[in-house]
């Protein structure tokens, strides 16, 4: 028995109650196929406030070459373990305060490392509102319930009559009270709950039905497929479940989850009823009541919540993957750019930027309807290109984008210029943000938005970190998932991307600096202020002069920042300052200076890595140093490429079934990808149309911003939907 109050037969699951003491390492090892030594080393480094980018890049020899994903998993599982221990201690304290902690119950709580099992153990002791069972116990009916549950042959009417008094008016009321108590016992039975959960996980069906009063509303039509829907919950795709839950949240459908009621009740009867006599009928009634009133609602909600959490996780994974690809999009680099935020009546906002992205000039031109001042606009753009030595043109992909692109390509410039169409998703959010106001206090939102479009071409990572990732528009049901978990994952993704590329310490914005390993918002602000007061950093060591940037922060951050004209050439590489002495020794052994070793493949080939192993830096670290010396400060991002849409397609009505068109992947979901064809509406390539054969993961076939060829298979102008195929 779980505790003395329960006369129910309890079946113990010995596998989950093995008598051993769990620790964090064992808990993590059960979930991950990672050696104990690697887990312990990682936990120690995390406890020392080392960041994941730092550990994965500069502590490979300690962790056994774990990557960022594995280190992140260890960190999450360790937090999960700590939360379980805290919850366990809270439960033990609460039960003890109620003087109900038996040695058996204490042992089961201490040995359990399953949250649901812990909550089931705690269920009888939880503080709650008064229940039917509580009311029956107050009337003195618990002994009657125990006698019935003992399932020995009794004259129940005679037995129940003994409990008739001022508070219990009849034998039936006494039996009803006993059934209420038994129903609660059945609800609290761990074996019953555990196996019902298993049945729900395996067999639950989710159904949705339209809310009649709202089904004819225009907004409801996008959810029309869920007006009458039924599907196995275990097999429902994440995007469909989130869509159904959104439809319910907006009041258009009602959702239910459940299993076959008769099967569930039969299982409970088989578990609880051990005799065939007069008591069986009362216990069966209690079982049916317990299932309908207590078990089914609770476990149904639990199961749906589990499914929602899995769907959230999948959606967040997709969002994070899309964000990573967007942040690591090819940069054009330090070029002088003319950027245009296109428009019709309000005009095209034009800005000229220098190599650092600083604003040189801005004005508004009106080449399109209703003004049609294309001649004047051409003349002014030619003048700006010459005056500011423009090297490339960046056009936002929103309203009037195609018309502006065609207009620009008609201009006869004195020299060849690359013309790029850039996603402007989130540019309006940036332009109205505090960051934008601080950068451009004397300019309005239209100028700030155009500047962002230009800077995105030069360096997407540096510009996009200024925008709330949720505003970039590459997520799947991003507003429906757990928002705190989404923020954690997106922040982690941004941090990974920033540190995989590295940043220029003398030009990086506060936003970009705040994502560098070991540097938060406050320290980033201090760095920017120090730079403003003292000028450019001469070397990495100067970072230590920044207020509140101590030795630990320096250790975590130094190798991720670059100084292009430092007196030490290693400051412009990913070699950590702690390894400078090793590189200097390598150069000395080869009879050359350090700067002569960098990028010198012939000399680097002569280095014996084994010779330079130290107690702090092993063979993996030495090999990374040698690799970095070959190509110091290598940017992992590819080079930007010019892309051209089909000039014959300017609007949806220009599309015809069977057309093969160039496009750019602009969003990836679990069910396929969306492709920009150069018009307002993006087309969908369903996962089944990505390539011949089965595709389990869209990311195996396409990446965000990938240039693709697609065939138009269906155009639905009324619903503004375009179906595409990559099977040509």
Which stretches of residues belong to each language-model region?
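C-terminal accessory/binding modules appended to enzymatic or scaffolding proteins
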Residues: 34, 330-332, 495-529, 647-685, ...
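Duplex nucleic acid-engaging cores and interfaces of nucleic-acid transaction enzymes
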Residues: 70-73, 80, 84-339, 345-431, ...
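Accessory alpha-helical DNA-binding modules that contact the DNA backbone or grooves
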Residues: 51-52, 63, 67-134, 139-165, ...
């Amino acid at each position: 028995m779980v505790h003395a109050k329960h006369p129910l037969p309890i079946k113990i699951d010995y596998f989950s109650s093995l008598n051993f003491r769990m620790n964090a390492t064992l808990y993590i090892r059960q979930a991950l196929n990672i050696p104990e030594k690697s887990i312990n080393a990682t936990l120690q480094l995390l406890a020392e406030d080392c960041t994941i980018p730092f550990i994965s890049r500069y502590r490979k020899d300690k962790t056994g070459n774990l990557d960022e994903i594995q280190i992140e998993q260890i960190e999450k599982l360790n937090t999960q373990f700590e939360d379980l221990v805290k919850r366990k201690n809270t439960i033990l304290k609460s039960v003890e305060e109620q003087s109900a902690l038996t040695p058996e119950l204490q042992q089961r709580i201490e040995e359990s490392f399953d949250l649901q099992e812990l909550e089931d153990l705690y269920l009888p002791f939880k503080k709650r509102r008064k229940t039917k069972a509580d009311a029956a116990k107050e009337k003195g009916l618990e002994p009657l319930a125990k006698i019935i549950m003992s399932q020995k042959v009794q004259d129940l009417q005679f037995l129940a009559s003994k409990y008739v008094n001022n508070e219990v008016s009849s034998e039936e009321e006494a039996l009803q009270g006993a059934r209420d108590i038994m129903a609660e016992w059945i609800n609290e039975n761990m074996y019953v709950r555990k196996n019902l959960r298993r049945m729900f996980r395996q067999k639950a069906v989710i159904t949705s039905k339209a809310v009649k009063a709202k089904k004819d509303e225009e907004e409801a039509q996008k959810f029309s497929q869920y007006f009458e829907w039924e599907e196995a919950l275990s097999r429902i795709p994440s995007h469909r479940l989130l869509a159904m839950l959104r439809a319910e949240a907006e009041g258009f459908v009602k959702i239910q989850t459940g299993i076959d009621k008769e099967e569930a009740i039969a299982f409970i009867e088989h578990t609880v009823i051990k005799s065939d006599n007069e008591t069986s009928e009362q216990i069966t009634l209690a079982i049916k009541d317990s299932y309908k009133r207590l078990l089914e609602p609770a476990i149904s909600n639990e199961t749906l919540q589990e499914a929602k959490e899995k769907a959230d996780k999948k959606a967040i994974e997709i969002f994070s993957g899309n964000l990573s690809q967007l942040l690591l999009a090819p940069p054009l680099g330090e070029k002088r750019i003319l950027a245009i935020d296109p428009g019709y009546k309000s005009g095209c906002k034009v800005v000229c930027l220098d190599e650092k992205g600083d604003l040189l000039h801005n004005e508004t031109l009106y080449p399109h309807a209703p003004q049609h001042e294309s001649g004047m606009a051409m003349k002014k753009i030619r003048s700006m290109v010459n005056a500011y030595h423009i090297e490339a043109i960046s056009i936002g992909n929103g309203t009037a984008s195609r018309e502006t692109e065609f207009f620009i390509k008609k201009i006869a410039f004195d020299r060849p210029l690359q013309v790029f169409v850039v996603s402007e998703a989130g540019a309006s959010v940036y332009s109205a943000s505090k960051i934008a106001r601080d950068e451009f206090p004397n300019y309005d939102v239209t100028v700030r938005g155009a500047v962002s479009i230009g800077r995105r071409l030069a360096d997407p990572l540096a510009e996009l970190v200024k925008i709330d990732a949720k505003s970039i528009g590459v997520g799947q049901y991003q507003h429906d998932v757990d928002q705190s978990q989404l923020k954690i994952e997106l922040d982690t993704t941004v941090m990974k991307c920033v540190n995989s590329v590295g940043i220029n310490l003398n030009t990086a914005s506060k936003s970009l600096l705040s994502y560098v390993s070991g540097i938060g918002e406050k320290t980033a602000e201090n760095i920017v202020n120090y730079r403003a007061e003292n000028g450019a950093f001469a070397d990495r060591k100067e970072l230590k002069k920044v207020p509140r940037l101590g030795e630990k922060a320096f250790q975590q951050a130094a190798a991720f920042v670059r100084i292009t004209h430092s007196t030490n050439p290693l400051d412009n590489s990913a070699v950590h300052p702690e390894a400078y002495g090793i590189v200097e020794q390598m150069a000395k052994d080869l009879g050359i200076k350090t700067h002569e070793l960098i990028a010198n493949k012939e000399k680097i080939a002569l280095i014996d890595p084994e010779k330079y192993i130290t107690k702090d830096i092993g063979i993996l670290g030495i090999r990374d140093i040698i690799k970095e010396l070959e190509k110091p400060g290598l940017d992992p991002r590819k080079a930007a490429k010019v892309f051209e849409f089909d000039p014959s397609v300017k609007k949806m009505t220009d599309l015809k079934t069977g057309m093969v068109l160039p496009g750019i992947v602009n969003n990836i979901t679990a069910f396929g990808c969306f492709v920009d064809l150069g018009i307002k509406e993006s087309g969908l390539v369903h996962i089944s149309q990505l390539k011949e054969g089965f595709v389990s993961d869209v990311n195996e076939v396409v990446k965000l911003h990938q240039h693709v060829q697609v065939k138009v298979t269906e155009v639905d102008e009324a619903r503004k939907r375009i179906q595409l195929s990559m099977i040509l």
